[in-house]
């Protein structure tokens, strides 16, 4: 599974 950084500010932002 991908790290939280993926959904933190890379994809959501």
Curated annotation (Swiss-Prot):
Q: Which locations, inside or outside the cell, does it occupy?
A: Secreted, Cell wall
Kindly list the GO CC terms recorded for this protein.
extracellular region
What is the superkingdom listed in this entry's lineage? Eukaryota
Key words of the record:
Cell wall, Secreted
Q: Kindly provide the name given to this protein in its UniProt entry.
A: 66 kDa cell wall protein
Can you name the source organism?
Nicotiana tabacum
Q: What is the lineage of its organism?
A: Eukaryota, Viridiplantae, Streptophyta, Embryophyta, Tracheophyta
């Amino acid at each position: 599974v991908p790290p939280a950084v993926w959904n933190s500010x890379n994809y959501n932002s």
